[in-house]
UniProtKB/Swiss-Prot annotation:
HAMAP family hit by this protein: PdxT
Function: Catalyzes the hydrolysis of glutamine to glutamate and ammonia as part of the biosynthesis of pyridoxal 5'-phosphate. The resulting ammonia molecule is channeled to the active site of PdxS.
Protein's UniProt name: Pyridoxal 5'-phosphate synthase subunit PdxT
Catalytic site positions: C75, H165, E167
Annotated GO biological process: glutamine catabolic process; pyridoxal phosphate biosynthetic process; pyridoxine metabolic process
EC number assigned by the record: 4.3.3.6, 3.5.1.2
Catalysed reactions, semicolon-separated: aldehydo-D-ribose 5-phosphate + D-glyceraldehyde 3-phosphate + L-glutamine = pyridoxal 5'-phosphate + L-glutamate + phosphate + 3 H2O + H(+); L-glutamine + H2O = L-glutamate + NH4(+)
Gene: pdxT
Organism lineage string: Bacteria, Bacillati, Bacillota, Bacilli, Bacillales
Residues noted as binding L-glutamine in the record, renumbered to the chain: G46, E47, S48, R101, I129, R130
Subunit composition and interactions: In the presence of PdxS, forms a dodecamer of heterodimers. Only shows activity in the heterodimer.
Membership in a protein family: Belongs to the glutaminase PdxT/SNO family.
Pathway named in the protein's UniProt entry: Cofactor biosynthesis; pyridoxal 5'-phosphate biosynthesis
Length: 184
């Protein structure tokens, strides 16, 4: 299968590496027309306001809102997928969740944690960099993992969202899960 990584910002190469380790073709998506050539899409981390502006500029928002393409959002990608973001309206509104930005603190408060992610494994390394958390989930959203009392991974239909950066580790099981369970 062909899995795209939105290549407007973020750790694009690292995501493509995880896709390839999962046995699939990874494609850096730079043009909206490329969305028709892929089976699933990863929205990487970075800065969510910048990501939204670039998606608007290059025409990705409208195309993705109308699409039923499976999408995996990490960190800023999770924020972009959310129906609501505390203090503002959501963007793509694919996941029926409310996200709180930077809820683990500033850049200096970044951390790593071993996560038990339902359906994947009990020992997934999560890298949290100015990470959001999921403050609320609506019916139909399955919680996959938490850090303390904060939700950090969810799925709903063809959509997977995580607060952390799985691509910054050598463990590609979260990407493999997305491909196996959402893209198929």
């Amino acid at each position: 299968m062909k899995i795209g990584v939105l290549a407007l910002q973020g750790a694009v190469r690292e995501h493509i590496r995880h896709i390839e380790l999962s046995g699939h073709e990874g494609i850096a998506v730079k043009k909206v027309e490329q969305l028709d050539e892929i089976d699933g899409l990863i929205l990487p981390g970075g800065e969510s306001t910048t990501l939204r502006r670039l998606m608007d500029l290059y025409g990705f928002k409208e195309k993705l809102q109308q699409s039923d393409l499976p999408i995996f959002g990490t960190c800023a990608g999770l924020i972009v997928l959310a129906k609501d973001v505390e203090g503002e309206t959501g963007y793509l509104k694919k996941l029926d969740i409310t996200v709180e930005r930077n809820s683990f603190g500033r850049q200096v408060d970044s951390f790593e944690a071993e996560l038990d992610i339902k359906g994947i494994a009990e020992d997934i390394e999560g890298v949290f960099i100015r990470a959001p958390h999921i403050a609320n989930v609506e019916e139909g959203v399955e919680i996959l993992s938490t850090v303390g009392d904060k939700i950090v991974a969810v799925k709903q239909g063809k959509y997977l969202g995580v607060s952390f950066h799985p691509e910054l580790t050598d463990d590609y099981r979260v990407t493999q899960y997305f491909i196996d369970h959402m893209v198929k």
